[in-house]
């Protein structure tokens, strides 16, 4: 696999994209840093060039605001967790439709080994995908699956039509991932998106997503990082203490894991695991759900 890290000084800024989309460069920077470790959890040769200087600036600012390296560790754990989730769906269960909602600068189409005939759909804003395509094209990267981009705003009611036009078959099994998005949306938008996903998925299809709890908004040590996000135009808006209830309302049975638990540690989580029964703490949830 070609190493594209020498292009770190390029900046694939999606002109016209909103600030939520810009957080994807922070995630790419975290993946790039992880990829440089000898004990890396994954290898993402495209991450550094996609992050650009702005992405590494995001990462530095978020870690400074948090007073720790958790803003760089959490994306790494989340990435590996959902890598395993997606590959299990395709390799063990035989799913051949993968949908990345708000794909941002995700590179799974290029760095994971997909089974033959896998179709991977990346949905995001036109400006985000255009800038990403330009950077990937310059890197001469080639996907390991059939990759289709769907340039549309997920907050527009008509986005499902764009996905269907690209060949997605809702009557067939699929696996979806909504990663790094719901925290930034209004409650009504979260429910609308989940309901649209339900309407587009067959029974037993799978959905992965991440959530924050409500306690994050009321925990003073977390306020500096929340303020840093707000200054960059990406304030947190949504949290839930009961992901299972949220998903059940839209027809999904959810299995919920916290970073630090077995299966979501990978030797990267720096804090002791605290059970959900202990109140008053901020929490993040990694959710694997099935359309029931």
Predicted features along the sequence, with ranges:
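Conserved beta-strand signature within the Rossmann-like core of class I S-adenosyl-L-methionine
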Residues: 175-177, 194, 199-215
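A short SAM/SAH-binding and catalytic strip from SAM-dependent methyltransferases
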Residues: 168-189
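Short alpha-helix
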Residues: 234-259
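Core SAM-dependent methyltransferase catalytic element
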Residues: 267-292
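A short, conserved alpha-helix within the catalytic core of class I
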Residues: 147, 157-161, 184-199
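S-adenosyl-L-methionine
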Residues: 137-170
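Short, glycine-/aromatic-enriched active-site segment of Class I SAM-dependent methyltransferases
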Residues: 218-233
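Rossmann-like AdoMet
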Residues: 1-99, 103-150
């Amino acid at each position: 696999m070609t190493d594209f890290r020498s292009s770190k000084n390029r900046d694939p800024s999606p002109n016209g994209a909103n600030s939520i989309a810009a957080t994807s460069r922070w995630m790419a920077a975290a993946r790039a840093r992880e990829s440089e470790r000898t004990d890396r959890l994954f290898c993402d040769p495209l991450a550094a060039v996609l992050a650009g200087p702005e992405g590494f600036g995001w990462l530095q600012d978020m870690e400074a605001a948090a007073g720790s390296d958790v803003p760089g560790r959490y994306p790494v754990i989340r990435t590996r967790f959902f890598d395993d989730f997606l590959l299990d769906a395709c390799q063990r269960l035989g799913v051949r439709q993968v949908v990345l909602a708000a794909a941002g600068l995700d590179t799974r189409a290029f760095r994971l080994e997909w089974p033959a005939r896998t179709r991977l759909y990346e949905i995001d804003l036109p400006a985000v995908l255009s800038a990403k395509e330009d950077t990937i094209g310059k890197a001469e990267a080639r996907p390991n699956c059939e990759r289709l981009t769907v340039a549309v705003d997920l907050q527009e009611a008509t986005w499902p039509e764009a996905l269907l036009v690209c060949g997605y078959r809702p009557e067939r099994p699929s696996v979806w991932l909504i990663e790094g998005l719901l925290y930034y949306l209004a409650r009504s938008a979260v429910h609308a998106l989940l309901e649209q996903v339900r309407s587009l998925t067959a029974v037993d299809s799978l959905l992965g997503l991440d959530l924050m709890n409500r306690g994050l908004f009321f925990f003073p040590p977390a306020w500096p990082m929340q303020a840093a996000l707000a200054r960059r135009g990406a304030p947190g808006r949504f949290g839930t203490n009961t992901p299972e209830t949220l998903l059940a309302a839209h027809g999904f049975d959810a299995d919920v894991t916290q970073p630090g638990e077995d299966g979501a540690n990978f030797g990267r989580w720096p804090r002791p695991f605290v059970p959900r029964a202990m109140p008053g703490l901020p929490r993040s949830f990694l959710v694997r759900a099935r359309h029931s």
